[in-house]
Design a protein with these regions (language model features):
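A conserved active-site cap/scaffold subdomain adjacent to cofactor or substrate pockets
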Residues: 195, 202-258
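Short, conserved loop/helix-junction motifs that constitute active-site signature segments
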Residues: 69-71, 160-162, 196-200, 277-279, ...
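N-terminal active-site segment of His-dependent metallophosphoesterases
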Residues: 1-65, 355, 359-366, 370-371
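Divalent metal-coordination and catalytic microenvironments
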Residues: 8, 28, 46, 61, ...
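His/Asp/Glu-rich metal-coordinating catalytic cores
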Residues: 53-54, 60, 76-216
């Protein structure tokens, strides 16, 4: 069975208040072309950017799905943290007759479907974005206080035939994956889930993180977003993830680069250099290094870069001012506060745990005692 793995479409999202519907349709048209050679599509959450999606976003998704139905393709979808599970699953029972399978309201177990191909059965399991509170009510005798425990509980209480090939769609953060500032996450890594939760699945189709990447092993895959949804993602390579699942244990995964209507880029340099570049419609963050910046520089750059969304200056003066400011900030911080800043810098913005902080304070007190 061949399938296309997508996630984090975020239909209706804006980039610094700029509407991206046209850009989103451009990449979805490419997905439709790819789907002509696939058996089914899986979408691992965050179809929309907001729980109450705009009319434009819903119309775009309806067009996309309708085009795939014309191709007689099966479609499997789970909701993400940006979606409203109830809204996304509205009319889901009717849509199944059109081979569209959307995760229903959470009931404490995986929602599973079986398909057949030349190698036998394939089971596709749907796991929408869940939080511990979503699962507690279904298992009152089990202590479920972490995302890890919530997912382990759902999977262990679901009927899974490990002898067959199993695909799971999920929308969670797997420990060790790289984040960007476009994604929501919890301080201290409270939403972390270990990859071992998904042991036994032949392919784990993940959503939630925008960078296309595998975690722990090749078959635990984040498809990533098709577009760059912040300038922090400007260096990311966006891909369509195409999977060819043959007999159990034999999987080929291919990444097809996405073509953008307008790229999201950061450019920097001196005004005289940037003003003489070839005009572009890309979405740009422009940083000037000139020591003196004329009041008309921004407007003149707009003539070359009509989609310049961010404009800034970095020169010897601004760097000096920034370094002085940082020095003043750090001089007024306690050791434990400095440790938290350093830890967050090294761990994708995650906070140290209470146990780690207690250990640090213990060491600080020991050092103070030795110095007295």
């Amino acid at each position: 069975m061949k399938f296309l793995h997508l996630a984090d479409l975020h239909l209706g999202k804006k980039l610094l208040e700029v509407d991206l519907i046209e850009d989103q349709k451009y990449v979805l048209q490419q997905a439709i072309e790819i789907m002509k050679d696939q058996d089914c599509l899986v979408i691992s959450g965050d179809v929309y950017d907001k729980p109450v999606a705009s009319v434009e976003a819903m119309n775009l998704f309806q067009w996309f799905i309708s085009e795939l139905v014309k191709l007689n393709k099966k479609i499997f979808i789970v909701s993400g943290n940006h979606d409203s599970n109830k809204r996304l699953a509205y009319f889901s029972s009717l849509l199944r007759s059109s081979n569209i399978f959307i995760s229903d309201e959470i009931n404490g177990k995986l929602q599973s479907y079986s398909l057949d191909d030349e190698y036998g059965k394939i089971f596709i399991h749907l796991l929408p974005f869940i939080k511990p509170a979503d699962i507690k009510n279904f298992y009152p005798d089990i202590e479920i206080n972490t995302y890890q425990k919530a997912i382990e509980t759902v999977i262990s209480n679901s009927n899974i035939d490990r002898k067959e090939r199993n695909i799971i769609l999920a929308h969670q953060f797997i420990t060790g994956a790289s984040r960007s500032d476009s994604e929501e996450y919890f301080v201290g890594g409270l939403d972390n889930v270990d990859a071992s939760c998904f042991d036994g699945f032949d392919y784990v189709a993940l959503g939630h993180l925008h960078n296309c990447q595998s975690v722990s092993k090749d078959t635990i895959m984040y498809a990533g977003s098709l577009l760059k949804y912040s300038f922090a993602e400007s260096s990311q390579k966006k891909n369509f993830v195409v999977v060819d699942m043959k007999e159990k244990g034999n999987i080929e995964i291919k990444r097809i680069p996405v073509k953008f209507l307008r790229d999201v880029r950061e450019i920097e340099g001196y005004f005289n250099d940037l003003i003489n570049q070839k005009p572009t419609n890309d979405y740009l963050k422009v940083i000037l290094h000139d020591e003196t910046v004329s009041a008309d520089y921004r407007n003149r750059l707009y003539m070359i870069y009509p989609n310049m969304l961010s404009f800034g200056v970095e020169n010897s003066q601004t760097k000096y001012e920034r370094s002085v400011l940082l020095d003043e900030v750090y001089q007024n911080k306690r050791i434990d506060e400095l440790f938290v800043d350093f830890y967050k810098l090294q761990n994708n913005g995650n906070q140290p745990t209470k146990k780690q902080m207690d250990l640090l304070l213990e060491v600080i007190e020991e050092i103070k005692g030795e110095q007295q």
